[in-house]
């Protein structure tokens, strides 16, 4: 945690009225303004759609090192498989540079996580995770049909066959 504190102190901060975005200086120069604009578009779109007025800025921290994301998010450095996590008005995310050689689409991740900010705020954190995830995945695809996970031959075969565990079990 002490090392993470030192790392965060070196991060560059971009702000507007609705967001506080923290990331490395190098990454801020590459896509920081695009990230801030995307977050603003997500807020404008989703808050209007769900009739929500957020009363405070949302803090978004994008980590260039997966271990820093892990410590900030889970208190431990080794938690592979997570792209981003939302804690209401705080979002943590792995940057594309922490996911090499196959980075995820950072725009889709930020949109998805901000959607959680909306749903968790509206429900005062009282909603099933599966529902919040489903809404975030849905809103990702509404924002950009190229985002999200599409049906592929393997998933189709599993759906049509007996490879999926029924919800009842």
Predicted regions and their residues:
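Alpha-helical protein-protein interaction scaffolds
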Residues: 1-4
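Hydrophobic positions within repeat-based interaction scaffolds
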Residues: 6-8
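Juxtacatalytic substrate-recognition/specificity segment
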Residues: 10-128, 139-148, 154-165, 169
């Amino acid at each position: 945690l002490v090392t993470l504190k030192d790392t965060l102190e070196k991060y560059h901060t971009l702000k507007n009225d609705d967001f506080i975005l923290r990331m490395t200086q190098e990454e801020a120069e590459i896509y920081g303004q695009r990230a801030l604009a995307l977050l603003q578009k997500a807020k404008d779109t989703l808050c209007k759609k769900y009739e929500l007025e957020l009363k405070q800025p949302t803090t978004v921290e994008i980590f260039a090192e997966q271990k820093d994301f892990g410590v900030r998010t889970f208190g431990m450095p080794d938690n592979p498989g997570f792209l981003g996590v939302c804690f209401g008005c705080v979002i943590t995310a792995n940057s594309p540079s922490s996911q090499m050689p196959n980075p995820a689409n950072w725009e889709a991740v930020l949109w998805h996580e901000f959607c959680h900010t909306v749903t968790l705020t509206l429900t005062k954190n009282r909603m099933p995770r599966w529902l919040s995830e489903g809404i975030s995945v849905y809103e990702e695809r509404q924002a950009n049909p190229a985002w999200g996970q599409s049906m592929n031959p393997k998933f189709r075969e599993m759906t049509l066959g007996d490879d999926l565990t029924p919800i009842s079990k």
